[in-house]
Amino acid sequence: MASKTSDVRPKITLACVECKERNYITKKNRRNDPDRMELSKFCPRCRKHTAHRETR
């Protein structure tokens, strides 16, 4: 069984670019997206759609 560190689909946390709050947890495929993920999501603290980047 593979360990969590070398998992193909790890859990990642998405943080708002503007206020730096970590709002979302999702999974990504490391083979398809080796770079850091960036998505447009709703930030409840900013009360608007902002870019959310993957944090480590």
Swiss-Prot record:
GO terms for cellular component: cytoplasm; ribonucleoprotein complex; ribosome. SUPFAM superfamilies: Zn-binding ribosomal proteins. GO terms for molecular function: structural constituent of ribosome. PROSITE patterns: RIBOSOMAL_L33. NCBIfam families: PRK00504.1, PRK00595.1, rpmG_bact. Keywords: Ribonucleoprotein, Ribosomal protein. The keyword Ribosomal protein applies. GO terms for biological process: translation. The keyword Ribosomal protein applies. This is Large ribosomal subunit protein bL33. InterPro entries: Ribosomal_bL33, Ribosomal_bL33_CS, Ribosomal_bL33_sf, Ribosomal_zn-bd. Belongs to the bacterial ribosomal protein bL33 family.
